[in-house]
């Protein structure tokens, strides 16, 4: 009998978030795929710190783990509803958007049916001998105590380690022992009571997570006379853009277009496109305003402040009062102001990291000039095309990287490379619009030199003034962008 150390799998997946779990579900019925998936957690949990009562996911139920690749899969969200006796109630509810807790329950339902998942495995190193990778993992018991080391061998690696919470520089080394909490949104529910007990709360950042926490706290904060501030460096509290032609940017065609752009232009577009998936749902924006209107009836003065164009630049702990002294800079006026707060919630997003366990592979892993994974169009990071990435490619592939609905498409691409065939049909075109230059109207390099400025010919006059530039392009500096933070589905999807 083969042991884990001697058996050679087709795939070893590292990380079991929604994207890794989706790939595991899609690989399960394939007879020519031998896969195993490892995760350091003891079970599947999807952002437990943000399971706010009544919160919904921001994408329709079709954007589940598998449906966009295989609508007939037994692992679909509709199959989960049928199995749990909730299909007809969901139908009568007449909403495309599942409850967030329900989506987490669905993912755990899928995980329970897969025998390829290995929990309590912390990967410590990956090495390669010829064409075979060896993944070494520490195995822990339910209490986190180390039991043993295991090795798994495979021809392909799937990196689904996802993203890590980010705190602003001003908060990273703040002394918090014995005082009110300074937390990332990912830990919100664990500290909700302590936040309200601190006497005053400041939420830093914009986007869906910040908005949900503000809405969850405002009634209790007013009832308990707790000041609640919401501060963002964005010029306003951006709604998420969810129009249909904009949604076509989550398409293979736009991904091809984005991937082919120069690095500096991709960086610029990445900042400009944050409202596509890091903004606030329009319904929640309206609910917050309606709530403030309700709470202020009778001329009541609310103990809350919503401050845009305000960037956190410094923070310190005042031992004499136990409060935090926060300094902000108004980016429009270039003026600073101070606020005191008993606790702080940072809604400033997540970022991808290059896993340390890849270090033994050295130069086999492609990195860009900023030290990030240099992910190919087909989601690989080595020249052999055998190390694949899930949700670590936003800087190379754009808005499709964190999108739940695009996950099955990416998994289909990965599985086609692993199997050498197309087990799930891969759509090449889905958008009505064209991104880039249309094929039937392309002009050869240098052909513009032959054009004359007469009779409606192309105007190639240089753009010399700022007004000229702004009339042609919608460029904005980083100060006018939404704070980098997760919308709960389009980014909060640790693979």
What kind of feature is each model-predicted range?
Residues 1-42, 46-48, 90-208, 212-441, ...:
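Flavin (primarily FAD) cofactor-binding/catalytic cores of flavoenzymes
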Residues 45, 58-76, 237-240:
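Short, solvent-exposed beta-strand-terminating loops
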Residues 47-61, 280:
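Glycine-rich phosphate-binding loop and adjoining beta1-alpha1-beta2 segment
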Residues 68-101:
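A conserved beta-strand/loop capping segment in the N-terminal third of enzymes
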């Amino acid at each position: 009998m083969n042991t884990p150390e001697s058996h050679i799998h087709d795939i070893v997946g590292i990380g079991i978030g929604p994207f890794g779990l989706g790939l595991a579900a899609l690989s399960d019925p394939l007879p020519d795929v031998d896969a195993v998936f490892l995760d350091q957690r003891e079970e599947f949990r999807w952002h437990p710190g943000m399971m706010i009562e009544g919160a919904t996911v921001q994408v329709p139920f079709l954007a589940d783990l598998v449906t966009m690749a295989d609508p007939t899969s037994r692992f679909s969200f509709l199959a989960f509803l049928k199995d749990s006796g909730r299909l007809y109630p969901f139908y009568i509810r007449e909403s495309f958007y599942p409850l967030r807790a329900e989506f987490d329950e669905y993912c755990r339902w899928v995980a329970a049916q897969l025998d390829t998942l290995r929990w309590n495995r912390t990967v410590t190193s990956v090495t390669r001998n010829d064409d075979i990778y060896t993944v070494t993992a520490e195995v822990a018991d339910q209490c986190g105590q180390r039991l043993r080391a295991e090795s798994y061998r495979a021809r392909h690696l799937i990196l689904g380690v996802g993203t890590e919470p980010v705190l602003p520089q001003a908060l990273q080394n703040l002394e918090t022992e014995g005082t009110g909490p300074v937390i990332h949104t990912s830990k919100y529910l664990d500290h909700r009571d302590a936040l309200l007990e601190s006497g005053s709360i400041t939420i830093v950042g914009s986007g869906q997570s910040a908005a949900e926490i503000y809405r969850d706290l405002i009634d209790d904060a007013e009832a308990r006379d707790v000041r609640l501030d919401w501060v963002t460096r964005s010029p306003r509290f951006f709604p998420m853009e969810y129009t249909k032609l904009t949604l076509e940017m989550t398409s293979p065609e736009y991904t091809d277009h984005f991937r082919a752009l120069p690095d500096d232009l991709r960086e610029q577009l990445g900042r400009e496109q944050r409202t596509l998936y890091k903004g606030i749902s329009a319904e929640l924006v309206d609910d917050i305003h309606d709530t403030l209107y309700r709470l202020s009836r009778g001329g009541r003065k609310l103990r809350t402040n919503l401050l845009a164009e305000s960037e956190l630049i410094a923070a310190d702990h005042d031992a004499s009062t136990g409060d935090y002294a926060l300094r902000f800079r108004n980016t429009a006026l270039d003026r600073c102001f101070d606020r005191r707060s008993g606790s702080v919630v940072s809604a400033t997003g997540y970022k991808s990291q290059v896993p340390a366990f890849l270090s033994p592979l050295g130069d086999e892993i492609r990195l860009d000039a900023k030290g990030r994974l240099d992910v190919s169009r087909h989601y690989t990071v080595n020249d052999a095309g055998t190390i694949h990435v899930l949700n670590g490619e936003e800087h190379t592939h754009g808005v499709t990287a964190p999108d739940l609905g695009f996950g099955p498409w990416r998994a289909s691409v990965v599985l086609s490379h692993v199997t050498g065939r197309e087990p799930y049909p891969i759509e090449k075109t889905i958008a009505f619009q064209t991104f880039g230059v249309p094929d039937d109207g392309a002009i050869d390099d240098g052909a513009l030199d032959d054009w004359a400025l007469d009779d409606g010919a192309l105007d190639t006059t240089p753009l010399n003034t700022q007004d000229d530039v702004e009339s042609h392009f919608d460029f904005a500096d980083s100060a006018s962008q939404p704070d980098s933070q997760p919308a709960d589905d389009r980014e909060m999807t640790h693979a």
